[in-house]
């Protein structure tokens, strides 16, 4: 079966063997206290990655995606339109990825967790899509664990799910998130119950570590 994330032609970042796509070596992290227990296994956990069809910051999609795959989970790419997603590296076009499921057809009960990558254009476009906002709201109502990074929290404000929450983000979102009822903190990664948030691509090692732990803990408790 073809994996849902595309092959890449950048040998220094991805490797393609006889079996097709093979994930990069594990992400190096900056913490000596990384959890390596069985609770971090995501076997059987289906994780929705929700992005716009254009504008997602590539690393904020691919690195959590790889972390979920390495832990045994099943990442699934959702977008408003079928076809492909155009990733960016800041302002430059990067790789494309095939959409697995249109968010129009997606329901929270079909997934065990949600990841919202960043990218300014991605987040701005996504918050204007009614089905994307509906899906995010459903995930919170169903108490699904959620990971969000950089500009990703914009859609959380649109979905009206931030009242009483504490999270971090790209600094320019601070006022928007506080106006939506959240407490904003400037931290590499912040965990508020089953909501994991980080500020920027430099925070990805910590973000991926906590995301896998929180997703696995939630799956183990069901």
Region annotations inferred by a language model:
Residues 13-15:
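Compositionally biased, intrinsically disordered low-complexity segments enriched in Pro/Arg/Gln/His
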Residues 20-22, 27-142, 146, 155-166, ...:
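Extended, subdomain-level signal for the structured scaffold at the beginning of enzyme domains
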Residues 150:
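Catalytic nucleophile serine of serine hydrolases
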């Amino acid at each position: 079966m073809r994996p849902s994330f595309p092959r890449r032609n950048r040998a220094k970042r991805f490797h393609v063997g006889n079996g097709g796509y093979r994930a990069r070596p594990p992400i190096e992290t900056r913490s000596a206290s990384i959890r390596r227990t069985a609770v971090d296994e995501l076997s059987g956990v289906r994780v929705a990655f929700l992005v716009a069809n254009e504008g997602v910051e590539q690393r904020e999609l691919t690195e959590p995606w790889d972390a979920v795959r390495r832990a045994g989970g099943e990442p699934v790419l959702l977008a408003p339109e079928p076809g492909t997603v155009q990733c960016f590296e800041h302002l430059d076009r990067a790789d494309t990825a095939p959409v697995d499921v249109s968010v129009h057809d997606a329901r929270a009960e079909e997934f065990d967790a949600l990841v919202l990558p960043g990218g300014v254009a991605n987040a701005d476009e996504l918050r204007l899509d009614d089905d994307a906002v509906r899906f995010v709201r459903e995930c919170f109502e169903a108490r699904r664990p959620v990971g969000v990074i950089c500009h990703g929290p914009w859609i959380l404000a649109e979905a009206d799910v931030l009242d009483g929450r504490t999270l971090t983000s790209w600094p320019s979102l601070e006022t928007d998130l506080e106006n939506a009822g959240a407490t904003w903190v400037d931290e590499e990664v912040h965990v508020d119950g089953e909501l994991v948030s980080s500020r920027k691509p430099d925070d990805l090692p910590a973000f991926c570590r906590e995301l896998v732990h929180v997703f696995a803990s939630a799956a183990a408790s069901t």
